[in-house]
Design a protein with these regions (language model features):
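Intrinsically disordered, low-complexity acidic Ser/Thr-rich regulatory segments
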Residues: 1-65, 117, 123-127
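C-terminal boundary/linker segments immediately following FHA domains
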Residues: 42, 76, 95-128
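Hydrophobic multi-pass inner-membrane translocation pores used for secretion
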Residues: 45-46, 50-56, 63, 67, ...
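Short hydrophobic/aromatic patches on the structural cores and recognition surfaces of FHA
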Residues: 42, 71-74, 80-84, 90-93, ...
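Short cationic/low-complexity microdomains
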Residues: 33-35, 87-103
Length: 128
């Protein structure tokens, strides 16, 4: 092994793509439920971009195709789950308890509290 590789110091990735952090349960209107830690993509057939790495690819069954192939991205920051719309065809709406619904601007991250519902086309997911 080359000396420069042998002496490489491994550093923590602070929950970015490392599968570490708080656990969240994503409960979908389709009846599907997934426990996630770290980062991921949600959709009918989610795929990362070249060079992008995520902990989870969450595929939901959605024959009506109102949910995009890669509809939402999620991750964690300081133990809080965030989502970002991936320029989906039908958009996403955040419905946090006690607040007005907020349409997601594609590419922006929205921090979610447990109990928040995110609409994706004709389907939705509740974070717990």
């Amino acid at each position: 092994m080359a000396p420069d590789v042998e002496n490489t110091r491994i550093v923590s990735r602070s929950g970015i793509g490392s599968g570490t952090g708080a656990r969240f349960v994503l409960q979908f209107s389709t009846g599907e439920s997934f426990t996630v830690v770290g980062s991921g993509l949600i959709g009918r057939n989610p795929r990362p971009e070249p060079g992008e790495f995520v902990d989870h690819l969450v595929t939901i069954t959605e024959p009506a195709r109102s949910v995009s192939k890669t509809h939402l991205e999620f991750g964690q920051e300081d133990g809080v789950l965030w989502v970002s719309d991936r320029h989906s065809g039908n958009g996403s709406i955040i419905r946090e308890p006690g607040t007005e619904p907020r349409p997601c601007i594609p590419g922006l991250r929205y921090r979610l509290t447990r109990g928040t519902r995110v609409d994706m086309g004709e389907q939705f997911v509740v974070v717990s």
